[in-house]
């Protein structure tokens, strides 16, 4: 009986965290617009933020749920690589 409640509470926590990540809105941060290509910040998991302000804002938002973002290399798409070569 006890394990049934633990499973239910765990599932609710996962759903809540997923909702928090999904419903973050970068416009709520009040970050000024930047040129996207020169100021991108990326995570190890492949998420790309337009600028440092958005990354820091999302990090602060997620830290309330105990989640930490880790910076990683920005992966260029095939189109972006071709454009960079020109």
UniProtKB/Swiss-Prot annotation:
CDD domains: KAZAL_FS. SUPFAM superfamilies: Kazal-type serine protease inhibitors. This is U-megalopygitoxin(3)-Mo3. Residues 1-20 form the signal peptide. The keyword Secreted applies. Contains 3 disulfide bonds. Belongs to the caterpillar 3 family. InterPro entries: Kazal_dom, Kazal_dom_sf. Keywords: Disulfide bond, Secreted, Signal, Toxin. It is found in: Secreted. Probable toxin. Expressed by the venom apparatus. GO terms for molecular function: toxin activity. GO terms for cellular component: extracellular region. Its main location: secreted.
């Amino acid at each position: 009986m006890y394990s049934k409640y633990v499973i239910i509470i765990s599932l609710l926590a996962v759903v809540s965290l997923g909702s928090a990540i999904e419903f973050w809105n970068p416009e709520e941060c009040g970050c000024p617009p930047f040129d996207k290509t020169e100021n991108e910040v990326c995570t190890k998991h492949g998420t790309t933020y337009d600028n440092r302000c958005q990354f820091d804002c999302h990090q602060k938002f997620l830290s309330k749920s105990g989640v930490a973002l880790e910076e990683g290399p920005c992966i260029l798409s095939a189109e972006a690589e071709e454009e960079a070569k020109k």
